[in-house]
Amino acid sequence: MSETLADSELIKLTLPNGDVRAYPKGVTGSEVAASIGKRLAEDALAIKFGGKLKDLAFPIQQDGAIEIVTFDSDEGKALYWHSSSHLMAQAIEELFPGTKFGAGPSIETGFYYDVASEHRFSEADLREIEARMLEISNRDLQIQREELSREAAIEYFKTRREDPFKVEILEDTLKDTPVVSIYHQGEFSDLCSGPHFSSTSKLKAVRLTSISGSFWRGDASRQQMQRIYGVSFPSEKLLKKHFSQIEEAKKRDHRKLGSELELFMISPEVGSGLPMWLPKGAILRNELESFLKDEQRRRGYLPVVTPHIGNIELYKTSGHYPYYSDSQFPPLTFTDELGKEEQYLLKPMNCPHHHQIYSSKPRSYRDLPIRLTEFGTVYRYEQSGELNGLIRVRGFTQDDSHIYCRQDQLVDEICKAIDLTQFVFKTLGFAEVQTRLSLRDPENTSKYSGNNEVWVQAEQDLKDAADKMQLNYFIGLGEASFYGPKIDFIVRDAIGRKWQLGTVQVDYVMPERFDLTYVGSDGQKHRPVVIHRAPFGSLERFIGILIENFAGNFPVWLSPVQVMVLPITDDFRDYAHSVLQKLLDAGIRAEIDERGEKVGKKIRDAEIKKIPYMFVVGEKEMAAASVAVRRHKEGDKGTMPLQEAIRLLQTDISTKKIS
């Protein structure tokens, strides 16, 4: 940039690595990206300035932090897929004139567009639309944003575009928005807040995956539409990798493996979304619970147990009742012997119950911090279409802890909670963990409880702790809970998928609502601060993710059956049973395969069941009080004395070895 510009004509932009560069006022995101590097300029999709996503053409007028958004980030993928939905709509309009367009968002797995057309779309149509999308990409159409009044936009979509769905959005959803935006690419225009990538040429590879029925705005009484799904990428290589990952994910599906490995079941007689744990699954679940309980005990947590239901007034006080009312089971209504009506809820959250335990007796500043913990089951009435094995259920168990502390203890306690969460993920083999600092949406503060001063303090506390722990976090505006900001931990599994798991949250709101106090050194009452903390989150969901991450090949310490004893023939059954008993006496979970099958068949079946170790016993092993050791997926490990083999197993178990 020119060095002759006066200081008043320059702005300072801070890059993610901390570098500060001077640019002329009005510099665009594209120009900033180009000044950093040619490759970055090619990959750039948008910018993030002042915490908000903007088009590359956005003119920057003031100092601030800037980030160049590429497809590598979650925000970049969402933007890329949203832009791709616009390209799909343009292709459909060119191929099937008269089609009207509803909503076309990005979703976690790509994008879709709801369309209204007399034409019934087929698989062959999808291939034709794909080809037209790539042809539009080759046109290199510039994608341009136009801002105009809501009234002008209504007129535009009534007369020039003749799209009743966009008119309805403008007259209803955006009725209080004076200025709206339209994006143009060639002859196609769409109502959208953006941002979008700068040219249709950014689309390099696309696959339209399916068609389903939908209703306008999700209302079955409204017009039926066709929903066309797709996914797109900046290269054909990434597209192929994506579908390869999908095939691998099918093999790892926890619902499939959960049935094959006899871990859990869901019975329609019991109810949708209510999993039942079979013996092997219960062992896996109990091992995870014991692991965390033991670690928490070492770190000063106190166990509590609370009921599965609570008086509705409890959740009105906490604010959970109005906040979760759409996803709760209906209240249970009872009339007592005096004719008084009472209502109870299946517990949607453990927090209010723990607050009652805290306030059950006077607390002193010397008592704090108090760390209460519970594996507490909670209930949410999820829609049937959203249920998914263990990942999305109606009854689930949270590893819920609430830490009550003084303000001067807060940052250290947050750090300790972060350390525990990191320890859990490391032990379970999640090596790649991202952290998101989930803050309020500054544009919509009305949906959060508590005053501004409290929120500013809570967000600063979390930032201080995250910095102290040297977390490489990113900011998630609008991702906070209604009663406090939080740190969310996002893990990447064995096939590259991201999952949001553990949470650490600061809460100044609930102590006020429940009038929680402690007596300070000055003899006066003070409010404690509450930290909500759950490394697993939902235990059911965590196990579902764990099953898929390990593809059912659990580390020895978690495996429901750790050793299968395989006698070569019936002649060695007695010795096999003595081996089994010694394993059981040593605290090792073992079974014996006494079927009259050849040992090769027994080995194959144990491999299918994903049992970590197999001890094969025959005449030679019996004579030497030894076992022939086989490792799942690794094969023969040689013959060794039984006691040595037991010590090997015990070491794997005690060290919680992953592989």
UniProtKB/Swiss-Prot annotation:
Pfam families recorded: HGTP_anticodon, TGS, tRNA-synt_2b, tRNA_SAD
Record localization: Cytoplasm
Region (Catalytic): 253-555
Protein name: Threonine--tRNA ligase
Claim: Ribosomal protein is one of the keywords in the record: no
Superkingdom field: Bacteria
Cofactors demanded by this protein: Zn(2+)
UniProt cross-references to SMART domains, sorted A to Z: tRNA_SAD (SM00863)
